[in-house]
Amino acid sequence: MTNIRKSHPLLKIVNNAFIDLPAPSNISSWWNFGSLLGICLIMQIMTGLFLAMHYTSDTATAFSSVAHICRDVNYGWIIRYLHANGASMFFICLYIHVGRGLYYGSYAFLETWNIGIILLFTVMATAFMGYVLPWGQMSFWGATVITNLLSAIPYVGTTLVEWIWGGFSVDKATLTRFFAFHFILPFVIAALAGVHLLFLHETGSNNPTGISSDMDKIPFHPYYTIKDILGVLLLILTLLLLVLFSPDLLGDPDNYTPANPLNTPPHIKPEWYFLFAYAILRSIPNKLGGVLALVLSILILALIPLLHTSKQRSMMFRPISQCLFWTLVADLLTLTWIGGQPVEPPFIMIGQVASILYFSLILILMPVAGIIENHILKW
């Protein structure tokens, strides 16, 4: 008799995705972050659901309702901080996951890669709208500044911004719709993640060498289930250390001041995980140019499969590309630092140099390195 997990219509799907899935025998810990992202998403949906039970999306009571959650709701403080810091863990995993894809040439799976880019945009939109909900100073001014960027679009810009706001400024209508979108988008993300996995399982996972591993596959369970559990435990440990010892480490003190449209904070900045893009936006003096650079800083990922010039898929055996990859990582860290600094010398110049370097590395230097490495192979 066939095992029920192989015959039952529902269990069969789970079996083919998480139990009997043929996986390469040599994938490293960099491959753990997909499952960690799944755990982060589940955790964010669960904590978010409980927060939504007590939150009110009204400008008069939103700030107080968050304070009420932290003070009066049973374990409300831990739910709130798990949700806020869970977003940070989500983005750490997300950026490592994308970085792994870049390093090992996983972008060769075009459908998986492109859905991943759509997922990245959706998660960023969700996180941005979530940051607006506590209705502190940085929530309000962040929402005002970022939505205002759309006014740079010629002809329809101003109309578009007022349409998103639901009025002539960020107000009650904006907060209500942001809450509605912030609630629904994680479920859209979950559906997209399902499609992401569906396309990945059509081809099978890549591996560090970038060479086909069809002749050497092992079952996902127990080998990678146990490996993923270790990753999950480390993720939860890190998150709990953050939540229980310094929950406000990654937040902005300005967000503990209720939103006031008449008082602008000295430095308006988004959460740390958007600072690199914010730095690129600010480094261009023209508004429309800045907005285009901001969008392209993420959308450039879609060009990466077209810019692949090397005969090898992975960077494992390509030292020049490796140097450029880690330069890119250092450059992104520099941009993240600059995004949190005031707009004054020398930060302006550092930001502009780092922005130019970011686009140069991806569009020019890395493809050229691939061609050089192809020639080195002939020697």
Curated annotation (Swiss-Prot):
Record membrane topology: Multi-pass membrane protein
Residue stretches spanning the membrane: 33-53, 77-98, 113-133, 178-198, 226-246, 288-308, 320-340, 347-367
Organism: Lama guanicoe
Localization: Mitochondrion inner membrane
Organism lineage: Eukaryota, Metazoa, Chordata, Craniata, Vertebrata
Binding-site residues, a ubiquinone: H201
Protein name per the record: Cytochrome b
Annotated keywords: Electron transport, Heme, Iron, Membrane, Metal-binding, Mitochondrion, Mitochondrion inner membrane, Respiratory chain, Transmembrane, Transmembrane helix, Transport, Ubiquinone
Keyword Cytoplasm on entry: no
Cofactors demanded by this protein: heme b
UniProt remark on cofactor binding: Binds 2 heme b groups non-covalently.
